Amino acid sequence: MTIFLFVKQFAEKELNIFIPDAYLGYEKMEKIDFLFNKMNRPIRICGMVKNEGEPGGGPFWVIDKNDEWSLQIVESTQIDFSNEKQKNIVQQSTHFNPVDICCSLMDASGKPYDLNQFAAHDLFFTATKDWNGSSIRILERPGFWNGAMANWLTRFIEVPADTFAPVKSVLDLMDGSRWK
């Protein structure tokens, strides 16, 4: 096994990096550049809990405008529920949005990444919100973990459900279970 095949398999299996079929035809320096570019990124490890019907999004494989797959945290407002395929994927999802996120923000030499380089600046979606008793449609930019971290290396791990204490409204803060 060549080093390039070993690194390719590691990148795909352990780091969830999409590697196009064309990679096998790349010249040596093209392979090095490609792998370095894909692997030299900040890392986020996201602790996810089992989905027990709470509203919200979760961890999904997403295809971007370049037809590249990546692991992303997707909010429910980003999902087209009129699309049966997307609706079924959400209904069959096993896990919920991250409870904990641990990040590595330095490169291999200890230098901080320019995190702005790894954000999806062109990402947006429309959402319906309530405003003064009326339903309005707004243009929304994704938040920190699903927009600003869109091009990070991502791993999802399962964590115990008791680490999950969602706050969807101020009344959720009154729930005594979160103060144990």
Predicted segments with their positions:
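OB-fold and OB-like single-stranded nucleic-acid-recognition modules
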Residues: 3-180
